[in-house]
Amino acid sequence: MNIREEMEKMEKEILSPFACCSVDSLGRDLPEEEDDIRTIFQRDRDRILHSKAFRRLKHKTQVFIQPEGDHYRTRLTHTLEVSQIARSIAKALRLNEDLTEAIALGHDLGHTPFGHAGERALNKLCSGGFSHVDQSIRIVEILEKNGRGLNLSKEVRDGIQNHRSSGKPKTLEGQAVRFADKIAYLNHDVDDGIRAGLFREEELPAEYRKVLGFTARERLNTLIRSVIFTSRGKDKLSMEPIMEENMQGLRKWMFQNVYTSSKAKEEEWKVDGMLKLLFSFYQEHPLEMAEEYRFLLKKGEEEGTEDPKLLLDRIVADYISGMTDEYCSHKFMEYFVPKAWEKD
C-alpha cells in the first residue's frame, strides 16, 4: 500500500459519511495514471496553485480600483481568505479539506482586470456575454497549459462552476466554498470600506451589528459558527435563517453605500472606455495578442466549428480577461497614448 492509498483509507475511516472521499471521485475527462503520494484532489489543488491564472490574481482588483495603500484586498488575498474559511468549515464538519481547498483556490480564476467593472464591460462587448464563473471553467478546461487545460477532477470543476450564490454544488465541499465566498467578501469589503474612509464601524446599521457582531472578528466568527453548527450531521450545508437574513441585509447596505457609489465607482467609466478600445483593437489586430491566444484562434479557425466572429470575440475576451490591472493599463498606454519622442 503506497502513501496515497494509505491517505485514501484514512479518509474513509475519519471523514463524515457526507464527505466526498478521494477514492470516490468521478475522475477526470482524460484518465491519468494515479500518483503514489498525492490524492486526486491534492493534485488538483497543486495544479491550480501553480497555474499562471492563479499567480495573476495578485494584481487584480477586488473592489477598489487602483487603491493607494498596501493593505486593500486583491483578488488573490480574497481567494486565500475564502480558502481559509472554507477549510475551517470543512475541518469542523469532517469534510474533505483537499477538495475544499482546490475549489476555493480555483473559484475566481476567471476574474477580469479591475474587478466587476471589467466583467461588466466585457459582458457588453463579447458576443454571447461574459461571466467570471464561466471563464474560470474555461481557464481550467482549455486556456491553461497552452490550450490543454489542467484536466481537473469533475468534483473540483463542479465546485468552481457552482460557487455563485445561485449555484448548487453537488458536494458539501463545494457548498462550504460557496458559503465561505459570501462570508469572506462581505467581511473584508466592510473592512476595506472602513480603511478607505467611506464609513466608520459605528455607522454600520445597528440591527446587523447586534446580530452579526460589533467587529470584523466577531462577524467572521459568528457566520462561520452558524454554518458549522447548523450543518452538523446533515447532507446539506446551511446557515441559521436569522444569520442569513442579516448577512443579506448588510450586503444590501454595502451595495447601496459602497459597491454602487463612492470611491468604488468613481473610476469605472474609465475601465469601461479602456476595455472597449482594447477589445476593438484586438478584433482588428488579433496578431497583437500573446502567442498562446493566437494559437487558440488559429486552431479554432482550422477546426471551423464556430462562427468566426464569435470565435474571435471569445479569444479576445480570453486575452483581456486574463490581464492584470497593471498589464491592461500598460497595453492601453502602448496603443492609445502618444509617446514622447526625442530629436535625432
Give, region by region, the residue ranges found by the protein language model:
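A generic, well-ordered mixed alpha/beta core segment in the N-terminal half of proteins
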Residues: L99, I103-N146
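Histidine-centered, transition-metal-coordinating active-site segments
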Residues: M1-T79, S83-I89, N96-E97, F130-D344
